[in-house]
Amino acid sequence: MVDHSTCRCARTVARLVPVIAGLLFLSAVRPVVAQESARDIVDRVDRLMRGNSSRGTVRMDIVTEHWSRAMEMRIWSLGTEYALIRVTAPQKDAGTATLKAGNDIWNYLPRVDRTIKLPPSLMSAAWMGSHFTNDDLVKESRIIDDYDIEIGFEGAREGIEVWEFELTPKPEAAVVWGRIVEQVRKRDLMPLWARYYDDRGELARSLRFEDFKTMGGRLVPTRMVVEPADKPGESTVITYADLEFDVPLDVSFFSLRRLQREAGSD
């Protein structure tokens, strides 16, 4: 019999992420030129968040109406298509892992020694019990292709020069959000926040990027906070403890065999 608490932990993943994998990758910033379009700028921001390869250690704190929990994880990523996320603490969840390869996601549940490929029906399920979904992990890498992008605001907000981008889905795009608004700091292309709206135009969740620090020789937002609009007081906070960039990884690292390794063996 499958331990449902373990399944919930494993089933339940922009920027990272949304979000988690995305923040592992940052590269050098060059100045923005005036003729760049909104799409060009968002594409550059996306590339800053998704370099060649990286690995890091993160802590995820989840607060819901009925419970709260903290988890520690190791993360490896290669480009936009590959990511491996392994829980290292608490001990009861250690070894639980998620592998992304292209559009496919597998979860490994060490308690029952079982690997599960997520079916389409579970793509909207919460990842690791958080306020992120499995679909976030797959779809975030295609934001430039799936959305039309315009600059909704350009100027100073609270003394900081920013862009605010309006993203609306293309007619043929199979996406969850009816609209996304993103704020980006001009001077270094650091994302400040994103707001996600449903197809009725109502705010569904918000994402904040905070605590900008230098890690691995690069400026990164080391803390992400996602809050669901319909659940006041609930949140998922992801905090980066360390990051390394341009590490030696190739596609063979992101295998089902690697997914099933014990925590601490990588």
Language-model segments: what does each one mean?
Residues 15-28:
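Bacterial N-terminal signal peptides
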Residues 40-43, 70-72, 147-153, 207-210, ...:
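Short structured motifs
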